[in-house]
């Protein structure tokens, strides 16, 4: 409980600082609106907030024809539930409409952002303790947590109605389950896990990556144990059916009430389906499109340079001290598997932005810790980390933008 309080204070303090960041200039075009709190502070209401709020106020909007949030209904429903609790609680002892439904929903989304970020930091701590076998000072965990709680994404999306904070939770949840939860579990237990992930797909698309990670992990286990049999093939087939079942049921329900399922990501941005579209023309078209998309992806990794640098430093120091560049153990291999799966997914996605690619940041951070050995116990290294984190947060707060 004490650590939850510490993480809560950390998240709120760091993100309160962003309220005092430079406000957008009149000539700056961005997807959203600046909401001033007073002469010194304010926040950005992202343009996507309009649909998030509309559907939370009236979830029936989710079953409208071609509705933007239709493919991910659960996040909206969660916000709606929290929002109406806030609304009715705030008006419990008065006949006046103190806060209003829309503001209640907005507060609900910010609460969700906080809850998601809090869970991400809790998982991050658990992962770090596993990777270091508990031999790491608590203050170092708090310092490393700053990278997750304070960055350009939390600056742009923490104070708005959005689901972008899930980009921090997804990779950490995947790593934690990979290295700690899934090992030795029965097939029935895994079926339940895959079904829950399938339900998660109705909240955020990256649950597809988690499913891919665990299927590959299970396939490798079959290979190691020389158990590639009909039973293992049946398990994989049933797992796929169970995972996609919630989405199929949602699509079936929409068709039952006369609504054609709509995925904004597919229709507007051609995410993933660009591959079949290109292949339907020719193999050359596919290769050309893949080349262009890979280039576009690597244009968005600039926000990861610091974390690539941290990993490189741990590899360099380890090489000097032990003669080995990388710590090849079960945990580091599983983190690398996550990095490859998440990285490949975002390479072939077909839509590219810094905020999507930054999903790799927590994985790179965990990989750096896994490879650091005793480095993080060194006092000089801890001071260097403190200075790095302080500069990182200061730059994020004082820099101009991003606003969407």
Where are these regions (language model features)?
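Multi-pass, polyprenyl lipid-linked donor-dependent membrane glycosyltransferases
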Residues: 112-116, 143-173, 178, 203, ...
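Hydrophobic, aromatic-rich transmembrane alpha-helices
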Residues: 121-122, 219-225, 295-329, 339-343, ...
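Specific aromatic-rich, kink-prone transmembrane helix
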Residues: 123, 166-183, 189, 193-196, ...
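Transmembrane alpha-helix segments characteristic
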Residues: 142-148, 192, 234-241, 324-348, ...
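Perimembrane helix-loop-helix junctions
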Residues: 178-184, 195, 209-243, 324-326
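Membrane-interface alpha helices of multi-pass inner-membrane proteins
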Residues: 189-205, 211-213, 241, 343
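Transmembrane-helix signature of polytopic, membrane-embedded enzymes
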Residues: 90-104, 119-150
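Membrane-lumen/periplasm interface segments of specific transmembrane helices
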Residues: 216, 223, 232-319
């Amino acid at each position: 409980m004490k650590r939850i309080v510490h993480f809560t204070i950390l998240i709120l303090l760091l993100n309160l600082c962003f309220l005092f960041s430079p406000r957008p200039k009149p000539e700056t075009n961005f997807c959203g609106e600046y909401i001033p709190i007073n002469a010194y502070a304010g926040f950005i209401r992202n343009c996507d907030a309009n649909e998030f709020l509309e559907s939370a106020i009236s979830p029936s909007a989710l079953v409208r024809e071609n509705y933007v949030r239709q493919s991910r209904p659960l996040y909206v429903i969660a916000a709606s539930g929290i929002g109406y609790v806030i609304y009715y609680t705030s008006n419990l002892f008065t006949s006046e409409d103190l806060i209003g439904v829309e503001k209640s929903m907005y507060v609900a989304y910010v609460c969700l952002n906080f809850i998601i970020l809090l869970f991400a930091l809790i998982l991050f701590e658990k992962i770090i303790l596993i990777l270091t076998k508990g031999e790491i000072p608590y203050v170092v965990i708090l310092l490393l947590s700053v990278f997750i709680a304070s960055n350009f994404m939390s600056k742009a999306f923490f104070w708005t109605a959005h689901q972008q904070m899930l980009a921090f939770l997804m990779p950490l949840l995947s790593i934690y389950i990979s290295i700690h939860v899934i090992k030795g579990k029965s097939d029935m237990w895994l079926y339940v896990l895959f079904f829950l992930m399938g339900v998660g797909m109705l909240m955020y698309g990256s649950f597809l990556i988690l499913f891919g990670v665990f299927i590959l992990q299970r396939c490798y286990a079959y290979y190691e144990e020389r158990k590639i049999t009909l039973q293992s093939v049946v398990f994989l087939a049933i797992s796929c059916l169970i995972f996609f079942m919630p989405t199929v049921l949602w699509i079936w329900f929409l068709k039952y009430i006369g609504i054609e399922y709509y995925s904004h990501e597919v229709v507007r941005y051609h995410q993933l389906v660009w591959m079949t579209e290109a292949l339907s023309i020719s193999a050359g078209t596919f290769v050309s499109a893949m080349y262009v998309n890979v280039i576009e992806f690597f244009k968005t990794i600039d926000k990861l340079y610091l974390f690539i640098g941290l990993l490189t430093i741990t590899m360099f120091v380890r090489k000097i001290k032990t003669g080995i560049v990388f710590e090849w153990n079960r945990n580091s291999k599983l983190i690398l598997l996550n990095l490859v799966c998440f990285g490949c997914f975002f390479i072939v996605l077909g839509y590219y932005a810094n905020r999507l690619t930054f999903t790799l940041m927590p994985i790179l951070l965990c990989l750096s810790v896994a490879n650091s050995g005793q480095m993080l116990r060194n006092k000089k290294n801890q001071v260097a980390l403190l200075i790095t984190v302080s500069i990182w947060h200061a730059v994020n707060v004082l820099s101009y933008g991003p606003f969407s």
